[in-house]
């Protein structure tokens, strides 16, 4: 089981209580990575934010909980100036504690695109490539979390899959804030087209 918290100090204690009381093995941690979020929401410098996030991650690892770091607003972030260095530190901690750390790429504003020649931070494939090749994040530890503000949640999620992300976050019928998230039913058919099989999934239940 898993749950999700912010990286605020008060939530750290809440997480410890939940882990103790519910026996949770994984927790999601919101780690805003764009300057917009770091400066205006967190009211920190990049250095302060990174040190703060890493301290929360380490606290999770100390009690044997696997962190899932939600890189909020990644399509407006400095990928090679902040995101990659941060993820390198995450991988060092993962190796030190021998506990997997997952990385969730959150296209919070729906700005991501999958066009050939698109540059980071807008390029979905560029983000996934950077995390895998330059930060050393294993494919099985990478997720894509898309928003559909510009109606690219499905194509961006599929692109993330194709370039190495092992997971895609979905919601039934795409229900979510603003214009929604990646629809689960759409990704079922994307999966079937890519793999050539539904692997036992029954698509008719969507009408129930």
Each language-model region and where it sits:
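Single conserved hydrophobic/aromatic residue that forms the stacking wall/gate
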Residues: 2-9, 13
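Catalytic-site beta-strand/loop segments enriched in glycine and acidic/polar residues
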Residues: 132-152
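Small-aliphatic-rich amphipathic alpha-helix that forms the alpha element of a beta-alpha
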Residues: 145-171
């Amino acid at each position: 089981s898993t749950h999700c918290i912010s990286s605020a100090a008060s939530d750290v204690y809440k997480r410890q209580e939940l882990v103790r009381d519910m026996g949770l093995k994984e927790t999601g941690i919101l780690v805003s990575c764009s300057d917009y979020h770091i400066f205006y929401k967190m009211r920190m410098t990049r250095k302060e934010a990174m040190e703060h996030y890493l301290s929360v991650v380490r606290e999770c690892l100390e009690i044997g909980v696997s962190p899932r770091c939600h890189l909020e607003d990644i399509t407006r972030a400095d990928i090679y100036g902040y995101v990659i260095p941060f993820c390198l530190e995450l991988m060092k901690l993962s190796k030190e504690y021998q506990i997997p750390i997952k990385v969730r790429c959150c296209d919070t504003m729906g700005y991501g695109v999958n066009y050939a020649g698109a540059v980071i931070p807008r390029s979905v494939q560029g983000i996934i490539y950077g995390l895998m090749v330059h930060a050393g994040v294993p494919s099985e530890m990478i997720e894509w979390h898309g928003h559909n503000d510009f109606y690219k949640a499905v194509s961006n999620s599929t692109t993330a899959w194709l370039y190495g992300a092992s997971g895609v976050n979905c919601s039934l019928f795409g229900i979510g804030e603003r214009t929604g998230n990646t629809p689960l039913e759409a990704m079922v058919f994307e999966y079937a087209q890519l793999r050539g099989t539904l692997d036992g999934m029954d698509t008719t239940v969507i009408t129930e």
